[in-house]
């Protein structure tokens, strides 16, 4: 997982 712009939608 990671904290990015789209973290609300998916955790990469």
From Swiss-Prot:
One of its GO terms (biological process) is defense response to bacterium. Keywords: Antibiotic, Antimicrobial, Bacteriocin, Secreted. Active from pH 2.0 to 8.0. Retains some activity up to pH 12.0. It comes from the Bacteria. GO terms for cellular component: extracellular region. The keyword Mitochondrion does not apply. Active from 20 to 100 degrees Celsius. Has antibacterial activity against Gram-positive and Gram-negative bacteria including Salmonella, B.cereus, B.megaterium, L.casei, L.viridescens, M.flavus, C.glutamicum, C.crenatum, L.mesenteroides and E.faecalis. This is Subpeptin JM4-A. It comes from Bacillus subtilis. The lineage of its organism: Bacteria, Bacillati, Bacillota, Bacilli, Bacillales.
